Amino acid sequence: EIYAYGLRNPWRYSFDRQRGDLWIGDVGQGSIEEIDFRAKDTGAGANFGWNAYEGRSSFGGSLRGGPHVPPVAQYSHSAGCSVTGGYVYRGTRVPALRGRYVYADYCSGRLWTMRAGPSPGGVREDTGRLGVKLGNVTSFGEGSAGELYVIANGSLEHFVQAEEAVAG
């Protein structure tokens, strides 16, 4: 069974541990990086549109198969050049991140979040930039309690509340 197709270069994907939804960071070719989303109960066979689309823009290829599922978020290469997919934060140590999808850009080192709603229509592209730059973010990880980790420039970092980082 093919669960999803029409992806150019999916660079990290995850399932929301609470809802079971699929999140994919898909690296673009020329100018757009995208975040793709598939709700748990929507079934297999999603066509994310590559090579007919890059992000929400027509790319010139031919759309094969079913209808195109556009990304829930995208950004241009003026903000970075290679998305690194992350996780929906379900931990307890950083309350402001609860229920938000956290992802990054490899080239700029920027980390962003966006709200993960209770349904596909509830996903919001209200992307907020976290006030941190880590360098080349290559991957995220999720601990058994839902806490997030990020790998950048050969180091493993753990997400904690700002006061905890200063005090600890």
Regions found by a protein language model. Name each.
Residues 1-127, 157-167:
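Beta-propeller domain segments
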Residues 7, 121-144:
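Conserved blade-ending motifs and adjacent loop-strand segments that build the rim/top face
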Residues 138-167:
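Blade-level signature of beta-propeller repeat domains, shared across WD40, Kelch, NHL, RCC1
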